[in-house]
Amino acid sequence: MESKNFKLPSPLATVIVGTQFGDEGKGKLVDYLSANYDIVVRYQGGANAGHTICFDGKSVVLHLVPSGIFHEGCTCVIGNGVVIDPVALLEEIKTVENLGYDVRGRLFISHNAHLIMPYHKLLDSLHESAQGDQKIGTTGRGIGPSYEDKVARKGIRVVDLLNPELLKEKLRENLSAKNKLLRNIYDREEIDVEAMVQEYEEFDKIIDPYVTNTQAYLTRELQAGKTVLLEGAQGCLLDVDHGTYPYVTSSNPTSGGACTGSGIAPNYIGKVIGITKAYMTRVGNGAFPTELLDETGELLGKIGHEFGATTGRKRRCGWLDLVALRYSLAINGVTEIALTKLDVLDSFEEIKVCTAYLLDGKELHDFPTDHQTLAQVTPVYTTLKGWMASNAAARTFEEMQLEAQRYVDFLEEQVQLPVTFISVGPGRDETVFR
């Protein structure tokens, strides 16, 4: 048989994943790398996670629009795996435009992305309030209820805004069930269907120019040789399948979610960069083996400004956990590590790193997948010498403080992956590449 030269996909896409409980500093890396990519895609989550970008003396928080929007040559895509709050999205678009950046023609929204409706946010808050001590720690932004409707095949998608009659029909069907909950369970007033239809028809007029079949668009661009950077929200340990269930988010922040949430085929993925904070934080409830409930934890939070970009909630702080990190690196197929917020450790004489867990007198090196077991483990620490000086002026690894270099070397040795990016300060330029 005559051989045929079929054109196979080139690995032109890079996935950026958080390897911890979110808040790892993904926004800075995406912002930094966006200048080298043609397209940046957000593939899951919603307005429950904020990416903070610092440039030109400004600090901007984005929840839905990809961080690459601040690079003029970059096109941004909100993928089908994202749940979109139209109100929050329009506010972000306005914020970006007010900073002098063009959005139209540079931002595309998947017609298959699901919408967060007002009843999702209301039910989210009411349900969380009713949980008492069993609260998950939701942001109250309607993310979970929107994903619930998606899985139940009752969700309202962006494409539904383009058909007012279909939108009205779906809203009536959904609100029939939601209003029963509001009235009978939570003793709240029902939501008016007609008012909501009118409100969302107005959203359609504004959003329509941005809506497209993003899966087809991304595939065409990749086939044409364009490069794509995919960014998720939260982190691996909050993944609904692989995280500390039930204290997790409602989607898949892992690298597998990048494909399902964007429509990009796996064989287009060439690199997976794991964003890892030099220490650990967590927002809300759930097991956290290395959490520091003392002055050290308070100091980490104070120096690191550890307050949620979305909710303003104080983050719990602790030392770096290599048991959890190895687990995340394996699940995501991470090819290299980006180490963030190393500067927060500049003031510590000693720095501890968890290398194993103790449970019932036995040492564990595998991350427990059930929350009950994880809540019972005790961390085993290795203590490293601190560097007690700033690395903010360093632009090469050799210019960093010697003990800071040793900290990075120790991390690489423990996880057997290269650390190729080190953030030594919040600014764009306060970065070391290797």
From Swiss-Prot:
It is an enzyme of class 6 (ligase). IMP binds at D23, E24, G25, K26, N48, A49, G50, H51, T139, R153, Q234, T249, R313. The keyword Nucleotide-binding applies. One of its GO terms (cellular component) is cytoplasm. Substrate binds at A309, T310, T311, G312, R313, K314, R315. Gene3D superfamilies: Adenylosuccinate Synthetase, subunit A, domain 1 (3.40.440.10), Adenylosuccinate Synthetase, subunit A, domain 2 (1.10.300.10), Adenylosuccinate Synthetase, subunit A, domain 3 (3.90.170.10). Binds 1 Mg(2+) ion per subunit. Belongs to the adenylosuccinate synthetase family. This is Adenylosuccinate synthetase. It comes from Chlorobium chlorochromatii (strain CaD3). The gene is purA.
